[in-house]
Every structure is written in structure tokens, then in C-alpha cells.
């Protein structure tokens, strides 16, 4: 409570402009001025094409038994998440004036996650193409995920160890210690369905997962600000981005003060880890610059953090815009991995377009129009659920006939391919997946997480381009 009062006092010092139409995006002006010199960070050269070469020991590894018996949920004490200490005054200098602030649906007077409430879910499910079958599939998926949570609250890509091999297709062995990434992928579908550690049928599941993330993170200080490092050798900054999204969404949905410190500290680590070109890669401040895939997860975390009124330095978003400019081609309709591409790369283009939507490009921007056209031509890729996950978000926000066609095919395919086998009921596995950093490496857990979040796309977030706002230009 004291922390919230202090934040409100600081916010009271910020001059707020006249009310404007609120749009769910992040934006910032580029001032043209160079930011502060980034401290040199020396690391080994990394081959971006082979993540398996980056194995290292987790600082505090979590023991995983070779086989585990399922445990019954135990009554939970009040929230015992260890907070990361910080002072509100530490962030006062990072807050942007009202004219430069990052805009979001949660700004000042809108509930950030209202789309996940029971009544709004029903409306958005109906309006944007969900149905009873897709919701039933989500319910079964959450049951499968809950059955595969470890006793310590974590999830593992070696999910078969938790269920004593009752369902197969675990992730690759070199992902076995990516507990933070796996736990985030286990948690996010619950929160997408409106479940929190405070309310819902699965609140104890969510509580244990959040507690694990906070306790397994590595607290520290960077640039005078507290950070919570959730990266790990088997998942690097992919792990941090995913885990930061989970912490920030949980805080945005509940405003639980116990999560404020960890969520803000996780955001601070993203700010610290940004590369000189404005993107993110496997390691903090990697000298060879960012890549679109890792950058996408960090931008999603920044968006989730700002939806919870956490503090995002405008220069971080300015850097992101520079990175997107670097990797775009065809006037922003296509996006490469670490530089511009001469051919359509499905997954990185979908990621780049979603980042553009979140950072201010409106529905009529030529890059958005042409990019959406390109994704619509590609359609659903049944061998790349990672692409499908991002493309579904882009097309759903864009709306119209292209989304309707894409949605029906993707929705019905996912519903029809959900496992009905006894041990694996409610899950998915795509054995021929070509996904970059997706189910091919994360196994049945990653496949199930992506598929479930796709089926929650109707209500996971409010639409960026609502009919009433579609004609408005976003004020930069």
C-alpha cells in the first residue's frame, strides 16, 4: 500500500495533457539525441543459428527427479513471494512528460486486463471468432498444464518426468534446465484465461508458478536500479522475456503489491540488456546486436509492464524503433532476423508487424497494410506454430475478412488436433514443427502453450484497432 501511495504521489507531479482517445500501443518520439554511453559488456561470440552451443550452468539449478509422483495441491499460505526492494524515487527521473508518454489502454482510467473478465470474454469471444469448441479446448489445455506442474511450482520441457511418462514428446535435452522459460509458458495460458493467484479455479497453480519465478530469479543492481535476472543458460534472454511477461501480466491483473518489485525489476533488466542497435539477443548488450525473435519477447514484456503502470524509459522504446527500422524491408512490410530480408520470412515478419502495432503504427500505415496482406497470403502454417502464434495476433488486431478466414482455419485445426488420449488429453504436439525456438525444442509443453494462447487470442488483449479508433492517428 505504501508503495502504491508513493507511486501515485510521483505520478501526481507529472503534467497530464488533455484527455485523448486511448490506444493500446507503446510509442515514443525519437529526439535525435544520442543516449547515454552503454557500459561495455564483454561476452563470447555466439552463433545465432545454433542455440545449443550456449549451454551453461544455471546459478541455482532446480533438482528434477528422474520420475515424479503427482502431488495433491496443498493449502497455500498468504502470498509469500519475496519482493525485490526498490524506491519509487529511483524511477522518477525515468518518467516521460505526458506528451511523450507511452500510450496504453490502461492509461489513467481503463482497466488493462478487462478483456479477460467473464462478461467481456464472452463478448469478445463472440465478436472475434471464438466458439464453444475453442473454449472447451482451452479448458482441457489448462487441466493438462495443471497436471504437469512440478511440486516446486515450476514447469519443465521434460514434462514426461512429472507424469511418469504417461504422455510423451518432451523437449530437447538441452532445454531441460530452462525452468524459467518453461514455467512462464505454463503460466501464461492460465492468465490469458483470466486466472490469477488471487482468483479462479487454478489460483493455487498460478501462485506456485509465480513464487517459483520470483525465487529462481537472480536479483542485482544495474545502473543504480534493482534488476531481477530471469535468464538462464538453457534459455538465455528468451527465458527472461517470457518470465517477465508472466510477472508483469500477473501484476497488471491483480495489482498485488508483492509483485510490484519483482515485475519492475524484471523490466529494469530488459532495459539494461538492450543492445546498441536497440534490439535484444541471447545475452545482455550483445555486441553484434539484436535479433527479431528475442526482441519480440522483450517488447511483449515491456507492453505487459506498461499495462500494469510500470515504468518504461522512453529511450528504450526509441531504441526498439531503431532496431525495427534496421531489420525491415519493403517499407516495413517484411522483417528479417538480424537485418533486412529480400524474401518473406514468415515468423520474423509476424513478430515485426506486431511490434510495430504496439509501438504506434496505425491500421492504415502502408507497412501494416502490405504486411497483413503478406501474412494473409501465407495463411496458417501447420508446421510452424510459433509463426501462427504471432500471425494470429497481428491479423486479429487488424480484423476484417483476412482475420475471419485465417481464424476459422487455425481455430478449427487446433480444436481438431488436440489430443484425446488418456495421458495427453488436452495437449498438443506438432512433430514436424519447424518453429524457430518453438515446439521442436520445447516439446509438448511449448506446443500446448502456444496453441492455448492462440485460442485465447479473442480476449487476451483488447483490440488495438477498434472500430471507433481505426480512423484516428496515434499522436507521437
Regions found by a protein language model. Give the residues of each.
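Extracytoplasmic intrinsically disordered, low-complexity "stalk/linker" and propeptide segments
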Residues: 55-113
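Extracytoplasmic/periplasmic juxtamembrane low-complexity linkers enriched in Pro
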Residues: 1, 6-72
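An alpha-helical repeat/solenoid feature that recognizes helix-turn-helix modules
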Residues: 7, 93-143, 147, 157-205, ...
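Acidic Ca2+-chelating loop motifs
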Residues: 153-155
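Patatin-like phospholipase
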Residues: 213
Amino acid at each position: 500500500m505504501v508503495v502504491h501511495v508513493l507511486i501515485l504521489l510521483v505520478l501526481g507531479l507529472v503534467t497530464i495533457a488533455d484527455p485523448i482517445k486511448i490506444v493500446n500501443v507503446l510509442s515514443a518520439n525519437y529526439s535525435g539525441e544520442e543516449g547515454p554511453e552503454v557500459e561495455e559488456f564483454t561476452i563470447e561470440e555466439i552463433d545465432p543459428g545454433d542455440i545449443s552451443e550456449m549451454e551453461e550452468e544455471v546459478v541455482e539449478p532446480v533438482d528434477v527427479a528422474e520420475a515424479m509422483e503427482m502431488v495433491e495441491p496443498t493449502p497455500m499460505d498468504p502470498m509469500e513471494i519475496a519482493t525485490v526492494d526498490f524506491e519509487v524515487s529511483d524511477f522518477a527521473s525515468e518518467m516521460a512528460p505526458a506528451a511523450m508518454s507511452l500510450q496504453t489502454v490502461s492509461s489513467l482510467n481503463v482497466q488493462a486486463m478487462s478483456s479477460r473478465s467473464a462478461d467481456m470474454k464472452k463478448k469478445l469471444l463472440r465478436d472475434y471468432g471464438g466458439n464453444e469448441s475453442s473454449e472447451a479446448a482451452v479448458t482441457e489445455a489448462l487441466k493438462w498444464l495443471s497436471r504437469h506442474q512440478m511440486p516446486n511450482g515450476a514447469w519443465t520441457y521434460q514434462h514426461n518426468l512429472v507424469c511418469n511418462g504417461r504422455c510423451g514428446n518432451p523437449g530437447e535435452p538441452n532445454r531441460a534446465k530452462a525452468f524459467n522459460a518453461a514455467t512462464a509458458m505454463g503460466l501464461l495460458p492460465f492468465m490469458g484465461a483470466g486466472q490469477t493467484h488471487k482468483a479462479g479455479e487454478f489460483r493455487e497453480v498460478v501462485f506456485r508458478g509465480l513464487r517459483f519465478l520470483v525465487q529462481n530469479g537472480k536479483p542485482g543492481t544495474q545502473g543504480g536500479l534493482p534488476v531481477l535476472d530471469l535468464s538462464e543458460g538453457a534459455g538465455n534472454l528468451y527465458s527472461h522475456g517470457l518470465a517477465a511477461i508472466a510477472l508483469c501480466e500477473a501484476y497488471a491483473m491483480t495489482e498485488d503489491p508483492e509483485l510490484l518489485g519483482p515485475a519492475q525489476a524484471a523490466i529494469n533488466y530488459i532495459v539494461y540488456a538492450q543492445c546498441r542497435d536497440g534490439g535484444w539477443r541471447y545475452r545482455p548488450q550483445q555486441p553484434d546486436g539484436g535479433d527479431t525473435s528475442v526482441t519480440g519477447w522483450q517488447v511483449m514484456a515491456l507492453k505487459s509492464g506498461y499495462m500494469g503502470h510500470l515504468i518504461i524509459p522512453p529511450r528504450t522504446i526509441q531504441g526498439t524503433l531503431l532496431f525495427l527500422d534496421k531489420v525491415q524491408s519493403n517499407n516495413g512490410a517484411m522483417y528479417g532476423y538480424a537485418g533486412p530480408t529480400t524474401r518473406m520470412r514468415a515468423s520474423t515478419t509476424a513478430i515485426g508487424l506486431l511490434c510495430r502495432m504496439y509501438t504506434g503504427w496505425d491500421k492504415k500505415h502502408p507497412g501494416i497494410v502490405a504486411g497483413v496482406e503478406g501474412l494473409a497470403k501465407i495463411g496458417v502454417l501447420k508446421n510452424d506454430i510459433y509463426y501462427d502464434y504471432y500471425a494470429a495476433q497481428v491479423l486479429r488486431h487488424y480484423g476484417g475478412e483476412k482475420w475471419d478466414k485465417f481464424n476459422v482455419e487455425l481455430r478449427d485445426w487446433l480444436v481438431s488436433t488436440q489430443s484425446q488420449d488418456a495421458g495427453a488429453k488436452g495437449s498438443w504436439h506438432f512433430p514436424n514443427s519447424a518453429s524457430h525456438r518453438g515446439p521442436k525444442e520445447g516439446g509438448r509443453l511449448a506446443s500446448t502453450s502456444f496453441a492455448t494462447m492462440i485460442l485465447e487470442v479473442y480476449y487476451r488483449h483488447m483490440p488495438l484497432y477498434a472500430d471507433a479508433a481505426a480512423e484516428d492517428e496515434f499522436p507521437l
